[in-house]
């Protein structure tokens, strides 16, 4: 794979807040985020994304990472696109580009541990690229008939020879920040498959026939034995493992009731006050954690940070 005339940049360029699309800006600069079939990408020493100024020669396909409803006046001078390559081609590209002074490598942690605190815009692009990859690269056949379903270049969707439209799959999941009625404590859980010091929010997939409120109520009861007294929607996030949309709620419960683990998935659960939670997160930042909390890339961490900010911590 040739990388001739391809420059690599470690950091985001300065962009104007808004650029009106005129004849002068219609041919905007394009930067490419290279993503392999398995989901790896190019990162620098600081963990943030590297972009190419032109696409690799042996790419599978590429797609825009801009929101579909972006108004022309909101577009920046740079368009970002994801370009997909085979795993071996990304590895070869990394070796060629590794000779540059700023260096690069293939991400081994991938999206799971991407430093959203350092590069939230890049994290959003990476998540979108992974979500689109599943449809553009992997969903080549109808799940019902097994027919080949290539992407129609005019409509941008997959069509079988018999005319069936194969749409992207999105699997909704729910997450719960469980809170005491007085809002002084939150309940975090330890999964049986995790190290004993790792705690996170309750989460699970929506079952067929459920709405989101029923799903989060069920998940809380199944994993803690507690009844939801109140639900408050807070936020949502892309979680492309495999193709989830995570919908997050605050769930108020009676903290005087005993916590049980009905479905066997949870090993233990623990109530945290705001100072206790803030201390656990601070220790994780210093590299000497007694408890492992959700990383900065996870929407669970955003839920916890939001609650702590309301407490002045």
Kindly label every feature range from the protein language model:
Residues 139, 146, 156-157:
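Residues immediately within or flanking Cys/His clusters that coordinate Zn2+
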Residues 151-201, 205, 227-228, 232, ...:
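N-terminal strand-loop-strand
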Residues 142, 176, 249:
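Conserved hydrophobic/aromatic pocket- or pore-lining residues that grip, position, or stack substrates
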């Amino acid at each position: 794979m040739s990388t001739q005339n391809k420059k690599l940049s470690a950091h985001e360029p300065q962009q104007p807040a808004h650029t009106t699309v005129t004849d002068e800006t219609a041919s905007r600069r394009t930067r490419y985020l290279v993503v392999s079939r398995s989901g790896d990408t190019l990162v620098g020493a600081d963990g943030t994304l590297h972009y190419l100024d032109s696409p690799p020669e042996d790419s599978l396909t590429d797609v825009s990472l801009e929101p579909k409803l972006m108004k022309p006046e909101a577009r920046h001078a740079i368009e970002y696109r994801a370009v997909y390559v085979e795993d071996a081609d990304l590895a070869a590209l990394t070796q060629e580009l590794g000779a540059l002074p700023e260096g690069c490598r293939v991400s081994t942690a991938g999206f799971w541990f991407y430093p959203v605190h350092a590069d939230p815009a890049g994290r959003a692009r990476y998540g979108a690229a992974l979500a689109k990859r599943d449809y553009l690269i992997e969903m080549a056949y109808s799940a019902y008939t097994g027919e080949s379903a290539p992407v129609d270049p005019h409509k941008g969707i997959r069509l079988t020879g018999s005319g069936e439209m194969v749409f992207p799959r999105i699997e909704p999941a729910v997450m719960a920040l469980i809170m005491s009625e007085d809002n002084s404590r939150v309940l975090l859980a330890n999964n049986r498959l995790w190290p004993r010091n790792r705690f996170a929010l309750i989460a699970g997939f929506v079952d067929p026939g459920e709405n989101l409120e029923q799903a989060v109520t069920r998940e809380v009861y199944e994993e803690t034995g507690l009844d939801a007294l109140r639900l408050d929607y807070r936020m949502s996030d892309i979680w492309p493992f495999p193709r989830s949309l995570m919908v997050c709620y605050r769930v108020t419960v009676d903290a005087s009731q005993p916590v049980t683990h009905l479905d066997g998935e949870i090993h233990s659960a623990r109530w945290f006050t705001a100072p206790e939670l803030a201390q656990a997160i601070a220790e994780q930042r210093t590299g000497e954690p007694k408890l492992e909390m959700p990383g900065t890339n996870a929407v669970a961490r955003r839920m916890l940070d939001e609650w702590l900010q309301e407490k002045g911590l």
